[in-house]
């Protein structure tokens, strides 16, 4: 056994599947003082629900799903509201400690609010963390093939630990099983129905739950929609985001005169790196020693794709402006950090690989990649990494349109390249009782909930069964980083 595996065994003994003799459906609740990241405390309950790891296996392990329940402040509370984090791999409990804590508290006027840790995440057991640290070779020009091989090598270590040593059935970690977890949670809570409050991958899970258990869902909020066939991103959506961003940059009074054609600037920098990669010396934060890092087109494409549609987008003009002047220090430092980060979550890889893509979408991505600036880098390291994880594909029926009478509130941002407005509009067709809030200028994640108090107002109206009075909301304009001319 390698030293890495020995160490993981010691650190993660508490993350094992629940003993087989414990009964499926067992719910444990205890009083819990919840504390957020600011030190604010609120009385709550900590819950743990035992469910099968793989429902189709009569000899399945039991696993434990963790959640925190914030009791309703209403005298006549409605169905519980279950928060579904994104990722996949995000923690609902962890999310509640952060910037969305006031929103968790506000929704209590509707019903109990449950911060839920999906199977394999957060406080749920096992938490399928992969602690293998990447070691991308620095003396070789970075490429998709080189990076995938390093990721696959580390994936093998994580798979060996969880599957072979801890006897976890990784094939049980898919969105269908997670949807059935929510049905089991509803039953354990004694609720006739639950409402779902979701974002990003959480909407992928919410849609699957509404397909599998439509009668169990009272209402659903989907922010940043990722439909059943949206796991793989379309290059055309990413390109449209860059075009929208370029228009904002051109109109910006601070930087527009220096960057009148952002797409042209991006292309010129990519072409330069394609023809002549740059070697940059930066300090390794771990060793405090200077190392040489190769920055080429792949590196810069990946950095952009990894951050596109987030608040980091505001740094893109300065990044490319400096690069056009020959300064590649920032991308070199970022790539060094990426090349030494931990692998991530086995749950995340298994979920995305199982959800997969239809042949139609795969062909569309391949076709569009040839005509767009970032090509198909937004999906890296998928689908190649799935060859290592070997997650059973959920099939095209899973990826087909969802049709249900559940009332749904979609929330989208015009600058969200990860889960664009078109995703929500595509799936709204299956929900005749739906509303769509569009936030002008909002990127992915927090801004979909927090960029305006009107968003919370709309959510509360929707959960009360009232018409949503404002469906067009303006977020604060993006503040671009200064160009730092020399």
Features from the language model and the residues they span:
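Structural motif
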Residues: 284-302, 309-311, 339-346
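A general alpha-helix detector
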Residues: 244-248, 299-304, 315-318
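Sec/Tat signal peptide C-region and signal peptidase I cleavage site
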Residues: 16-20
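Bacterial N-terminal signal peptides
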Residues: 8-15
